[in-house]
């Protein structure tokens, strides 16, 4: 409770009584006759007065002519506390159980330069269970340039007698001054006789209770308010049925327990504890210290409240509060005390990872955190103590900051038991990031508890969005179950959607506003009864080659993910890419499986006409492919194993349906994984997690036949980063941002890209007639964002090579959470039509060659005159998730690096008259080949498979890797072992079964095969189906090598010996090895 609030409530009550309104009655009256009437009688202030409005605290309220509509508004000035502002009473005007729409217009008084121009709308109510603060709108940004419409909803609920009910407008900036106009509060579909109200709601008692579903994993908890714990309240009934752990939503926060110094009030907190004991539940205590919902007196000098308390006084007050609170529950409840842990400190980290600049930090210093833990441990040594925070599940800068903080606290002996991950996520949150965050934080040796779980719908509560939410909840709880060794509790922040703290419209929990089970409930409680959402993915137009080498064109395709478990929670998953032409649907299934078995395999389900029938029709197909390559024989397939699992390439005939652009094909993918038991232990799917694919196509996902991959070109060159369009940029073709993520018009850009050995350069010329950077959020300012995926892995999460680089029109830089910004440079300039952003993004993770393709996208953010982002437009990705997901990036081809033979600074005595002299000298100068001694190259000496492999690695600038022992004839310690490992992982060499034959002399056809794999990595080369060569000894070439040799000959990389023979089984010499490597450089324009 805020400082002076008790005094305010007394004044408020007296005010109402003076004005003759009857306040004290046992039940709220019904509505007036006009159900759609505005409940605010003077919301437009057109009377020229503020009649009907009262003060929260002691601000100055006055009618003014700075109107939104009409002639008058209300000016709010003279604020000195965050909670101060105008208030309006709704006592006697609102009906229990009814929902209301709330709308008002707000504009800042000019000239304030506030760093926190935010408005919060709150409803204060007092009933038999005490005082409550219900958020209607949380921290809406407003500006002085124009009026901002603030919208929210409110549902009235209370226990016993409603004594006080008023709405007030506040701000986290305690001195912010603002105007208010056009305040409208109207009922939503007013409750009529016969409609559902609390006493008519019946919960579903015949469905599985959640605490039993997860009894082998962790307690399932829920945040509660004591006003909803009466036995007749269906919220209490739902709580008792499904949950076995409670946390107080507000009743145990500092302002609730000690509103004034020394006066502790435990009535509401005790009601929750009593309920927990009566229903055999455990509890989490929340929270002993927070920067919010803590009375101002904590931080004030008792002799002069305008001055801050001293460090010693604030520490004394903190210790008194913590000790008194823990002693109360320990003493009153003894062995029955259900509280097993406390959030000692809550939200001490800012979003940028630094310690929050709270009054605790300002007055005490950073050691206030360890002091709080010290006091709590001293008060109750048996209690588990947690640090709790939000946005630490994204595996970004705040996750790392929490890791560093807890590591430091533990190293100093602070008695910290665990980390509370609030987990306020949304329907686009990334499971891989959550998994990485849990495992990172758990590696500190502490418990992990999910403490405030809900899933924001981002304003979309459509049926489609609810089904999408259900899938993510299932994936989330499968992850929690897989991480059960770390997770000791999962707590939802609210029992049902009607009591969520989030602004409406929203539906973030498992039970809806009528307390009925939603799709999300069934997805985690009994997936067989769920209705899966229909996911969609694009198949890009193209005809990849199916064979020993994975076609390079797959690099351009965004994957879908077969990662939803049907059985088990830890096992094989896969990325699946799709392409199409008029004959085939092509799939590349890359399975991650660390327990290889002959039982492992995939199943592909195809519904060619995508009519989603509940039984198979003649166009529907089911294919099975085992990890050893056996299986369905009526499709083209190729299966190879690798260090991560196995890869399946498929060509599925679709010529019979005459496919055309934008057609849809139904598809599902199922993975079967034997983890060593001799039977299938885990089953994973892309779409249908009810596992009905064998007989039912209605839950297959959709594959949309789409255009070829989006590829732009960056040419080699080095511009000056000065925010100007230098002449060098005129050589570059431009791309245009025309993929709308938010809005359909507004600021756009043309962009050009260049590269050199140190940087990727980007020039964006933005058209924007109204520049604004007033938002406190950089992403809402007029700005350009560049997204880079250096290895173009197109993962659903950010890897270490990925980056998000944001620059606004005033050259203010900001970056995504995991982006390495070291060395980043930018410059901007204003133009008649907008602004220019020029950037230099340092390379960190890849070998730079002509033909390299990286993942790339560019985004323009457009702010309106109020600082609100109204437009987002990209070059490629329409998802809006580029900040956390690289799979939708487009592709950028690096080209144009000049050719030119290096000075021949290295020579050997024995190559003076050799036909390959010039070639050997160039390669030796580049350290790609080496002599047998400093003076002898021995060009006629045969070359081994290991030696040629080492040369190719140097050509590609691939670093050696520690040998993992894949081959029986390669031993740790062999000079070539690490080179073999790196080349094997890169797909340059394959071996034959368990042998690599490293010391065998390499044949000419073997050398050509390896060389062409290297050429594919240097360029965008795609192997043609040529078949026979023109060599006289074509019949002597092995079948597996014939097409490779034919392609190499066509490109001029190899030549025959005299008499036009290739001599495929002939042993290659060191001179011939140098010649073919030189040919690779020459033909790829990398000399």
UniProtKB/Swiss-Prot annotation:
EC number(s) given by UniProt: 3.2.1.91
Domain GH10: 204-527
Keyword field contains DNA damage: no
Domain of life per record: Bacteria
Gene Ontology MF terms in the entry: carbohydrate binding; cellulose 1,4-beta-cellobiosidase activity
Active site, renumbered: 347, 389, 452
InterPro entries assigned: Carb-bd_dom_fam9, CenC_carb-bd, Galactose-bd-like_sf, GH10, GH10_AS, GH10_dom, Glyco_hydro_5_CS, Glycoside_hydrolase_SF
Domain named CBM-cenC: residues: 37-188
Keywords: Carbohydrate metabolism, Cellulose degradation, Glycosidase, Hydrolase, Polysaccharide degradation, Repeat, Signal
Signal peptide residues on this chain, from the entry's feature table: 1-30
The keyword Ion transport belongs to this UniProt entry's keyword annotation: no
Reactions catalysed according to its record: Hydrolysis of (1->4)-beta-D-glucosidic linkages in cellulose and cellotetraose, releasing cellobiose from the non-reducing ends of the chains
One GO term (biological process): cellulose catabolic process
Domain SLH residue range list: 903-966, 967-1025, 1028-1087
Family designation: Belongs to the glycosyl hydrolase 10 (cellulase F) family.
Stored PANTHER family: ENDO-1,4-BETA-XYLANASE A, GLYCOSYL HYDROLASE
UniProt-recorded name of the protein: Exoglucanase XynX
Gene symbol of the encoding locus: xynX
